[in-house]
């Protein structure tokens, strides 16, 4: 009998795309401290657009979880997202010279629109498996790239803090929890988990590509 975890199986089924994402040029340049400000600005402006849909998805996780313990974990997660991570974005925009006007007027890239739609689709299903699957990809893929390079953090604080936000003890615990939840409930809804996992990973890779296709020059 196989002892492979369900979440590991899902990642293996998307191995090629997952590896392209976690070893992307963006990740390499981030650790090298060579990523251009215009690329970093584009990436962060678009990533910040996820916040509203991500909170919708987290809200759905609270209401569809089947026990108190996971509800409490997701509620805690909401507080964390609204705190330190939100502060990072605002500080980074200031450091990169991205004005409020730019943040408001620059349109979504296709991957941004696609991932926001996927999160809202998962939330609308009221299917706990779909919801946890999308949450897991959004977090686990980032933990993977953030922990693959053992070099000291970059000197640029915008780069260093983005890495740190995806490699600290509580973040590791969050991914462990999400994996345990999907390992627990996913096998009974295998097709749903496979579908949402595959689509989420594909969009994550496209999102990295888009940062280079749509650079943003700060105004101030």
Language-model features, listed with the residues they occupy:
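Hydrophobic alpha-helical segments
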Residues: 2-6, 118-121, 209, 213, ...
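Long, non-globular segments of proteins
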Residues: 4-5, 9, 145
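Short alpha-helical hairpin
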Residues: 11-36, 175-184, 217
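Alpha-helical bundle segments that constitute or directly flank the non-heme di-iron/ferroxidase center
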Residues: 15-20, 34-64, 80-84, 133-143, ...
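Active-site-proximal alpha-helical scaffolds that flank and shape metal-associated catalytic sites
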Residues: 45, 69-170, 198, 202
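Structural helix-adjacent loops and short alpha-helical linkers that scaffold large soluble proteins
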Residues: 65-69, 191-194
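Long amphipathic all-alpha helical oligomerization modules
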Residues: 171-197
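Acidic, carboxylate-rich catalytic segments that either coordinate divalent cations
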Residues: 193-220
């Amino acid at each position: 009998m196989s002892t492979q975890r369900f979440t590991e199986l899902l990642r293996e089924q998307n191995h090629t795309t997952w590896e392209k994402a976690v070893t992307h040029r963006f990740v390499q340049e981030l650790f090298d401290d060579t990523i251009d400000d215009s690329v970093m600005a584009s990436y962060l402006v678009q990533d910040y657009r996820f916040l509203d849909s991500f909170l919708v998805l987290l809200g759905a996780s609270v209401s569809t979880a089947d026990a108190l313990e996971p509800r409490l974990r997701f509620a805690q997660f909401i507080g964390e997202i609204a705190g330190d991570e939100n502060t990072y974005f605002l500080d980074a925009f200031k450091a990169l010279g991205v004005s409020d006007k730019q943040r408001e007027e620059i349109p979504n890239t296709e991957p941004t629109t696609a991932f926001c739609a996927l999160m809202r689709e998962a939330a609308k299903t009221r299917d706990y498996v779909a919801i946890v699957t999308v949450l897991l990809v959004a977090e686990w893929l980032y933990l993977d790239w953030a922990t693959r390079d053992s070099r000291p953090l970059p000197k640029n604080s915008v780069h260093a803090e983005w890495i740190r936000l995806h490699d600290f003890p509580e973040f590791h615990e969050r991914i462990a929890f999400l994996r345990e939840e999907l390992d627990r409930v996913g096998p009974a809804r295998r097709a749903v988990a496979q579908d949402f996992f595959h689509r989420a990973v594909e969009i994550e890779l496209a999102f990295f590509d888009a940062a280079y296709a749509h650079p943003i020059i700060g105004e101030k």
